[in-house]
UniProtKB/Swiss-Prot annotation:
Similarity comment: Belongs to the HdrA family.
Designated name of the protein: Ferredoxin:CoB-CoM heterodisulfide reductase subunit A
Cofactor note: Binds 4 [4Fe-4S] cluster.
Gene behind the chain: hdrA1
Binding site for FAD: 149-172
Naturally occurring in which organism (per UniProt): Methanosarcina acetivorans (strain ATCC 35395 / DSM 2834 / JCM 12185 / C2A)
């Protein structure tokens, strides 16, 4: 690109005051214009009008370099790249200065924020002086999608994709799809002011999945790893055996003769099942499954009764685990939630007192195929029976509970405690509202009142959050005689007869109350399932501080994950009810289909480049931990762009400087340092992955740090050598901090130890100056700790300044 600054311009976004209220944009413009730089500002640079302004000025001024001062590049980086490319400008000619998350939002001092904004813009201008055009790398996108999780979100996404012609693989780690919705018995219908059978809605969809020609269903299967790049992901799956062939007719003979009883997780442990069983009566696929942890035959004891009983010869003890590899263009994550572990709140007696349940456990008690066959009983009053191998199906009985009685009294007094583990800033709690708990309590209260109007029900609440049409449902439940006490109970006490007392302060009349109860039901928070936490790690997806998978932008890209080509929906993304889950799953499917059909795809080519003139064929770079480099037939080192992660380890290995990362060359990094640094500054080299997101989240979390902390994004700290660190010191840096991704995903598990070793080597190489470099592992939830590190180092820098 041309030399000099006459072909460059700066565009500054006000961001509706998010930037302009903290940064004096007029002062920034005046200073830059005095330096001979064209500067333009607009209220919303990301809007169609803002983009039109950028394109107009590029064409009018024959610009070949553009700096946009706006929010973090992770929000609108792709949008702005497309914007400038529409004018014919190479995307390498764009730099985005983060004036919001890493300036305006973290520096309350307007003068300091303005000075830093100037330095960030100057740094990007300097960086562009050394830019080289990036060639486009195009690849065809695999025409297959993967949906992870077989609950209502995964089912909805898979059917939407398949119905629109996309070949889809649906993976579920349990023996049946259905997820949590299969357990809840009833769903509330606010428009009808009634409750409806959940399985009546879910079961047809499950069967549609099984029969769909475009869907491959893999149960008892987990995702082990992901490699490749967006549009061409290689997914490695581990499929566990059922020990039952597909020829199983689900007659139930095997289960009837099985001598082993195990706790039934589907019924929350309040019922037993056999070691060979269906997960529930409407399971899909409707094939029995043997639990290898409890099966006598699989644990070396002579049994085989199930095999003897099976007339279809479907029992197969020889089945082994399988490894399945898929090539997919897009992934939808729908791994769901689990209930908060309410035993973390021992004051409520869960796990101590028999008659304290969660709402999910109550749902199973009220279910016709639950431990009491739908009869409302205290746990202490019913015996733990084995599940029927051919239990009740979803027929007319879903509108009525069983007439069978276990000869005990229905609980006369029930107390429900809301927000257990949510809206709770104490240890073990979660700050967020789980959104579904209030409605679940109202639903169960309504169901019980309709069948047992004499039962007294009291709901202890902080606020009843019933939005939209749900307010009508809330009022309808109130009219049935359900009592509401505003207050968070202090404790639950058990009496000798197993009855309970709930102590609570009613904050409306400011009186302490002792509420007698035969049954206490805890509305537990919705937390990420183990599968959600695991898949976020395996796929290297950003998570919020609570462990839910974080969307790229809550408004503009609510189902896009932090990685291109991977989408998230349902309760894997945040707490929500069935209605919102289905809506979001449909959107995720639309986004995944659009991504797959947009073929060929232009790759992000911030990957390794090899200068063949400098390369001595020493072979050191072939130690790439991802095997992205190889030697071709002519003896040249070549790169596989689909494998290269752009980590920069090869740049460290190459002693000739023949390998560099496109967009992060030494010249570019040095120029950016020269533009941003002043005497006494703290310079942070920030990994462009999780670490960069964590830095952005400092601003999102309304935390602050001094304005003499300057951050430069790098692929990883491996691209920063001794020469670059010394360059930083020569240009005023008091200290240099390496901020790296934690080793909590497969890629980072490889790279993190390399960055640690590299850092230790640098300290040694730098001698006395090694005491001025620091290393920080950045977890997304630890924004406060990272801000504290910045502040501590900045104070040392102020002393030098």
């Amino acid at each position: 690109m041309t030399d000099g600054l006459n072909k460059a311009a700066v565009f500054i976004c006000h961001c509706s005051g998010n930037i302009s209220e903290h940064v004096d944009i007029d002062a920034v413009k005046k200073t830059l214009k005095a330096e001979g730089i064209s500067v333009f500002d607009y209220e919303y640079m990301c809007s169609s009008q803002g983009q039109a302004l950028i394109k107009k000025k590029i064409v009018e001024g024959s610009l070949d370099r553009v700096v946009i001062g706006s929010c973090t590049p992770s929000k609108h980086g792709t949008l702005f790249k497309k914007c400038i490319q529409e004018t014919g400008l190479n995307r390498a000619g764009l730099e985005i200065a983060n004036l919001r998350e890493q300036c305006a939002w973290v520096h309350p001092d307007r003068t300091g924020a303005t000075e830093k904004a100037l330095s960030l813009l100057r740094a990007k201008l300097k960086r562009l002086e050394n830019v080289e055009p990036l060639d486009e790398i195009k690849v065809d996108i695999a025409q297959q999608a993967l949906v992870i999780g077989g609950g209502i979100a995964g089912i909805t996404a898979a059917l939407n994709l398949a119905d629109n012609g996309v070949s889809t693989v649906l993976v579920e780690n349990n023996s049946s799809i259905g997820g949590q919705m299969a357990k809840i018995g009833k769903i509330f219908s606010p428009d009808k002011l009634a409750e409806e059978c959940a399985m009546c809605s879910l079961s047809p969809l499950m069967n549609e999945v099984a029969a769909h020609p475009k869907i491959t269903l893999l149960t008892r299967t987990e995702v082990e790893s992901l490699s490749g790049s967006a549009g061409n992901f290689t997914i490695r799956l581990r499929k566990k055996p059922r020990y039952v062939k597909d020829s199983c007719t689900a007659c139930g003979r095997c289960s009837r003769v099985c001598p082993v009883q195990v706790e039934d997780e589907f019924n929350c442990g309040h019922m037993d099942k056999k070691a060979i069983s269906l997960r529930f009566s409407q399971s899909v696929p409707k094939i029995y499954c043997i639990d290898p942890d409890y099966c006598l035959q699989l644990n070396g004891e002579a049994c085989g009764k199930c095999a003897d009983a099976c007339k279809n010869e479907a029992i197969d003890f020889s089945q082994k685990e399988e490894i399945v590899e898929l090539n997919v263009g897009a992934v939808v994550v729908a791994t769901g939630f689990e209930e908060y572990d309410v035993s973390q709140k021992p004051q409520y007696g869960y796990g101590i007192f028999e008659n304290v349940l969660t709402q999910m456990e109550l749902a199973r008690v009220l279910g016709i195929n639950g431990p009491t066959k739908g009869e409302l009983l205290r746990v202490s009053d019913f015996s733990k029976a084995s599940s029927d191998p051919t239990p009740a199906t979803c027929d007319s009985r879903c509108e009525d509970s069983s007439d069978e009685s276990q000869g005990t009294d229905t609980p006369k007094r029930i107390v429900m405690i809301q927000c257990v583990g949510s809206r709770d800033e104490k240890e073990g709690g979660n700050r967020y509202c789980s959104r579904y708990c209030c409605m679940a309590a109202l639903k169960h209260a309504s169901l019980i009142k309709k069948k047992h109007p004499e039962t007294e029900i009291t709901i202890c609440y902080i606020d009843v959050r019933a939005f939209g049409f749900y307010e009508n449902y809330y009022r309808a439940v109130q009219e049935t005689g359900v009592n509401f006490v505003r207050g968070r109970p202090a404790e639950v006490i058990e009496k000798p007869d197993k009855s309970l007392v709930v102590r609570v302060e009613d904050t409306l009349d400011q009186k302490m109350r002792e509420l007698p109860a035969d049954l206490v039901v805890l509305s537990a928070a919705m937390v990420p399932s183990p599968g959600t936490r695991k898949i976020a790690s395996v796929l290297n997806l950003s998570q919020d501080e609570s462990g839910f998978i974080k969307e790229r932008h809550s408004k503009l890209k609510p189902v896009d994950s932090s990685l291109d080509g991977i989408f998230v929906c349902g309760t894997a993304q945040s707490p929500k009810d069935v209605t919102d889950t289905i809506a979001q799953a449909g959107l995720a499917a639309v986004r995944a289909r659009a991504f797959i059909t947009d073929s060929p795809k232009v790759l992000d080519n911030e990957i390794a480049t090899i200068n063949q003139l400098l390369c001595t064929r020493c072979g050191e770079c072939l130690k790439c931990p991802f095997d992205a480099l190889s030697v071709n037939e002519s003896g040249r080192v070549v790169l596989d762009p689909l494998i290269c992660t752009g980590c920069g380890y090869c740049t460290k290995l190459c002693g000739e400087g023949a390998v560099q990362i496109a967009g992060f060359t030494k010249l570019q990094l040095k120029a950016e340092m020269e533009g941003v640094l002043e005497e006494g500054d703290v310079l942070g080299f920030v990994n462009s992955g999780i670490a960069s997101l964590t830095c952005d989240n400092i601003g999102n979390s309304v935390l602050t740090y001094p304005s003499n902390v300057k951050l430069i994004k790098v692929p990883t700290g491996l691209v920063v050598d001794r020469d670059l660190v010394l360059h930083a010191f020569r240009h005023g840096a008091s200290s240099v901090l390496f901020v790296e991704d934690p080793p909590d995903n497969p890629r980072a598990e490889v790279i993190y130890p390399l960055t640690v070793s590299h850092f230790e080597e640098l300290k040694e190489e730098l001698g006395d100056s090694g005491n001025r470099i620091y290393f920080k592992k950045a977890y997304v939830p630890n924004t406060k700790g990272l801000a504290g590190t910045f502040t501590s180092l900045a104070r040392e820098g102020e002393m030098i300044r």
